[in-house]
Amino acid sequence: MKSLFLSEKIYVLILAGGTGSRMGSKIPKQFLELNGEPILIHSLKRFQNWGKQKRIVLVSHFESIPKIESICASYLENEDRIVQGGENRHSSMLCGLSVLDFKDEDIILVHDAARPFVLADELDSLCEKVRSDGIATLASRTSETVLEELNGKTVSFLDREHVWFMKTPQGIRGDVLKELLTFSVDSIPTDLCSWALTFGKTSSIVESNPLNLKITRKEDLDLAEVFSSLFQKISSDI
């Protein structure tokens, strides 16, 4: 691997293409309010307040772009972009990547807009892993017993010491991403790490804070209201 990349740039793709269908809402989930502000704004603020120089690209459905321009304008810098996404998460990620002029040493982070509780020190640790290992993701452990089922019946129990729940951001170094982009896929990957694994590239894990949930359903939004004050506390304690 190359030595430390002192001239690297950091790019952040925030995928904001949710429709709100699983939420049972006509309003896309990224626009639903959490403590008086859209969820998207909470997620955007996590990166704007990070303290690192970075370029942010927001990716969304065409019909949502005017709304994003309206609510996010004051949080975006001159080089930040809002771009139209694709038909699914992977194609939307590719749309965001297509506007980046990244180099081999650069770091690209991909984050779900519906995850508003990521910590700055986690972002630092993730970037360190990406520098050294090429691909990395935030993930969390479980204290629960994990089982596998088939047709509603228990089949086996998994060793929870080796079970992690995938989170975002996920990150990739520019040289590794360039290689991935040369391959064609037979099926649609669910995220950056599954895309990489399709071609034999494993991802390193950085442990995430326990509040880093993805707001997908109404009960998630209810939890997020509770988590918000806890998140502010752990953010200030670090």
Curated annotation (Swiss-Prot):
Site, Transition state stabilizer: residue positions: R22, K29
Keyword Protease: no
Catalytic activity line of the entry: 2-C-methyl-D-erythritol 4-phosphate + CTP + H(+) = 4-CDP-2-C-methyl-D-erythritol + diphosphate
Keywords recorded for this protein, A-Z: Isoprene biosynthesis, Nucleotidyltransferase, Transferase
Annotated GO MF terms: 2-C-methyl-D-erythritol 4-phosphate cytidylyltransferase activity; cytidylyltransferase activity
CDD domains: CDP-ME_synthetase (cd02516)
InterPro entries: IspD (IPR001228), IspD/TarI (IPR034683), ISPD_synthase_CS (IPR018294), Nucleotide-diphossugar_trans (IPR029044)
GO CC annotations on file: cytosol
Signal sequence segment: none
Enzyme Commission designation: 2.7.7.60
Domain of life: Bacteria
Any one GO BP annotation for this protein: isopentenyl diphosphate biosynthetic process, methylerythritol 4-phosphate pathway
Record's function text: Catalyzes the formation of 4-diphosphocytidyl-2-C-methyl-D-erythritol from CTP and 2-C-methyl-D-erythritol 4-phosphate (MEP).
Name of this protein: 2-C-methyl-D-erythritol 4-phosphate cytidylyltransferase
Lineage, opening ranks: Bacteria, Pseudomonadati, Spirochaetota, Spirochaetia, Leptospirales
